[in-house]
Amino acid sequence: MMAEKVTIGNCELWHGDCREVLPLLPPCDLVLTDPPYGIGDALVKGGRGGSFERLISANAAEWDVTPEKEVFDLIFGHSKNQIFWGGNYFEIPPTKKPLCWDKVRPNQKNLSEWEMAWTSFTGRAQMFKHCANGGFVAAEANEHPTQKPVPLMEWCLSFAPEARTVCDPF
């Protein structure tokens, strides 16, 4: 697929494979993203299954494939700072400032109670508490099967107040 650029106000939205799009962009101040964790791989291999599989959808194997190392190399080379949700699933250097989202939910059979973000920042680990409906976005339009709450993303942006350009390659 050929990369396509769409301008929305003073923002650019690129539609295409991040391996093709990132080299076209100037370096950015922050990559804030929630890369695919490989849930699709788990479903294909008979992972969680059950209600979780129905919730995520049968086609997760098509869109939720763990990114290759070259994608992370592109991101590191194209950005000053990074925040990767699900960073504990990827082969990247250890973080010196992990972030945690406590979903404020009782134990769920097949969903995590919290999620970790890998960051390029240094300092103490920090936690954000936001109630989610069964681990998913509460009281917000759920436009994506693994959507993060807007307040969580706003909190993430607070760690890079000087960032003028933010990229989400996924």
Give the residues covered by each predicted segment.
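SAM-dependent nucleic-acid methyltransferase catalytic core
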Residues: 1-32, 162-163
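Class I S-adenosyl-L-methionine
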Residues: 24-33, 37, 41-61, 67, ...
